[in-house]
Structures are given as C-alpha cells and as structure tokens.
Amino acid sequence: MLRLNIGLKMKKKSVAFNAILNMLRMMLTVIVPLITFPYTSRIFLVEGNGHLSFAATITQIFTLFASLGIYTYGVREGAKVRYDKSKFTTLAQELIAINMLSTVITYIVFIICVFYIPKMKEYKCMLLIYGVTIGFTALGLDWIYGAYEEYTYITIRQIICQVFTILAMIILIHDKSDLYLWAAISVFSSVGANIFNFFNAKKYIYSYWPLRRKKLQIVRHIKPILILFATQLATKIYSNLDIVLLGFWTSDYYIGLYNASIKINSILITCFTAMNPVFIPKIVGYIKKNQYTDFLDFFSKILRIMIGIGLPIVTGLEMLSSNILCIIAGKPY
C-alpha cells in the first residue's frame, strides 16, 4: 500500500511538472515571435517578409508529407511498449524506415517542383535553404520523447534553439541583404534540434537499424499512419493555403502585408489556447468517473472564461488593429 501511495504521488507530481513545462513551452512560442518578428519585419520590410513567408509555407507543406502522421502515431504506439526496450527498438526501426522512405520521395518531388514550376523557380534559392529541413525530418524522432514523456529534455532543447535564434538574429541580421542569412539561421535552429534528438535517442533504443537480418513489419503501420496524416494534411492545407494562393496570384508585397496580420493573430490564438492543457486533465477525470453533471458545470465555467477573455481581445483587435500592426510590424505595414 505504501509503495502504491508513493507511486501515485510521484505520478501526480510528474503530471503537474509536465503541465508546467508544457505551459513554459507555450509561453516560449508566444514570446519568441514577439521578439523576432518586430525586429525582422522592420529590417526586411514588407517584400522581404513576404518572400520569407511564401518559401517557408511551401516548405512546411512538403515537410508534412515527409513526416506523414508519424509523430502522433509514434507517441501512441510507443507509449504502449516503452517499458520493453526491445519492442520499442523494433517499433522505432520500423517507423524510421517509413520516415526515411517518405523523406526521400518528398525531397525528390520538392526538388523537381523548385526547378520546373515557374513560380517556385522565382524563389529557388530561398526554397533550397528552407528545403534542408525536409532532409532532416527523419532524424527528428520527436515521437520517441513524446512516448517517454521527456518534456524536460524537449523544453531545454527548445530554449537552447530559440535563444540561439534570437542571439544570431541580433548579432548577424542588420539590413535587407541578410534575408538569406536569416532563413539559414531559422533552418539551422530547426535542423540542430533534429540532430540533438537523433543522437540523444540512442539511450531509448538499441540501434537505429537492425543489426541482424530481421524482417521489419512496416506494412502494419501504413494504414493508421495515413489516417492520422489525412487529418493533419487537411488542417495544414486549411491554415497554409491562403499564403500559397497569395504567392501564386500576387506578389511578395501583398504576402508580407497579409502575413503580418496573420502572425499577430496566431500569437493571440496561442495565448488563448495556452489554457487548454490546464483544463483537459480535469475534463478527462470527470468523464472517466462518469461525473457528467460536474463535467457540464466545469465546461460552462470554461466557456464563460473563454468568452470573458476572448471577447475583449476580439473587440480590442477590431478597434486598434492599425495601431497594433504599426507597433508590432512597423509603419510600412
């Protein structure tokens, strides 16, 4: 009984600690853009910002195809076998093989598009810089850390990469000619995180590839991965199609103007949704215990809080949109 109580206390402490780390990471995703975007938007101005935005958006879509739905699937399946290193290693080897295959195919298609689609040829240099992230997708292995709930490592890694990005920006980015350098810094930060992940993952698996002749059961993963991927693809297309269409139909100037407003909107949405991880455990607890009355009461409280916070934000944005845009992005916007 004593062991059980200790185990439950440790589990509660772990959940609370993970929740704090998750909130910290959410805060970083808000704070860092509030530092980098106002700085770079004033240096690269509207056209430069639009050029960066279009290339980054195109690359994100290809990166999604390279990664498939492996993160979500890997976390789910990895959590089931994480206490058996042999089984976890087999799962990792199978998912790495799928990820490598999808990455190679995606990268080939990406290169063909860059060199043969007229609009993308205009962004060739920028796309090739951002395209490096596609090649390192298979090395990310984020799902391994998600399966083992290594949120401390994930948070520390994120802090290191983002601090590097901010310092490199301040030291190296000073005028319009640094546009490609800024893209390279952004890419290096992402690639660096993937390289960290790859080498650090060795402690969780025996090897990245079977040391003996062993037939990997790759086919069994394809269907569930593609189902999850379809959901992610629909979401990604919905959120990124606007920038892509603007890029093909208009110029960098209009992309830059649109991206500035979207960037501010996304920062506010991140602030708004940062509360979700705090509410979810309570909601799940009520549902598991079949306490539906308590669930409905708690849900109504959440709804009132969301409306109470969201309505003033929306009203403030409508009334002060020009001033907010000028403060964050600069007068050219």
Annotated model-derived regions:
Residues L2-K11, V15, L179-S186, I195-S239, ...:
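Interhelical loop/hinge segments that connect adjacent transmembrane helices in multipass membrane
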Residues V15-A16, S53, K85-L101, I222, ...:
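Interfacial transmembrane-helix starts/ends
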Residues N18-M26, Q60, L95, N99, ...:
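Residue-level signature of transmembrane alpha-helical cores of multipass secondary-active transporters
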Residues F37-P38, S67-Y83, S261, S266-L303, ...:
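Helix-loop junctions and terminal segments of transmembrane helices
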Residues G135-R157:
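Membrane-interface junctions at transmembrane-helix termini in multi-pass inner-membrane proteins
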